[in-house]
Amino acid sequence: ISMKGGVPSHDTFRRIFCILDFENFQKIFIAWTQDIKKSLKIKNDQICIDGKTLCGSLNKLKSMKAVHMVNAWSTGMSMSLGQIPTEEKSNEITAIPLLLDLLDLKNCLVSIDAIGCQTEIANKVTVKGGNYLLAVKENQKGLYEEELRQTEIMRLN
């Protein structure tokens, strides 16, 4: 592509991103990723949901907390399908269902770490036609003990 005025600067991109409506951009971006998925004929994708604190986003001088995002990553397309900002890591539980609402999960395996091991999240994935792989930790005592029991039964058989 020929750019008569030269390549846009970092500042130009920053100004554009600052005026974009985040929610509308996100909807358009997710629709675009779904079109790519269809054109690549990816039918059984794995979607990895994970929260990350953005490096360098903490600003102590301005009393600004670090930015935390919950991201959905497609292993089949090797790209992010969408993300939701959260106030803190503890808010991932409320952000994950919002992110799942935006995604097409039909025939997908959705993997989430232990913070996503919630009945509401598992139900949402299955209602949307997907399957889930959730990590279980000891802080969910009943579920953890049942998992150990089932694992022992499978090992003995």
What role is predicted for each listed range?
Residues 13, 74-77, 129, 136:
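Preference for short coil/turn "hinge" residues that link or interrupt alpha-helices
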Residues 5, 52, 79, 134, ...:
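Flexible, active-site-adjacent loop/turn segments at secondary-structure boundaries
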Residues 6, 10, 23, 57, ...:
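Surface-exposed loop/turn and secondary-structure junction residues enriched for glycine/proline
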Residues 86-157:
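An internal, acidic/charged active-site-proximal segment
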Residues 35-106:
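RNase H-like nuclease fold core
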Residues 4, 70, 147-151:
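Generic hydrophobic, helix-prone segments enriched in Leu/Val/Ile
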Residues 3-62, 129:
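Active-site- or DNA-interface-adjacent structural scaffold in DNA-acting proteins
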Residues 16, 57, 81, 120-121:
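Active-site-proximal flexible loops/turns
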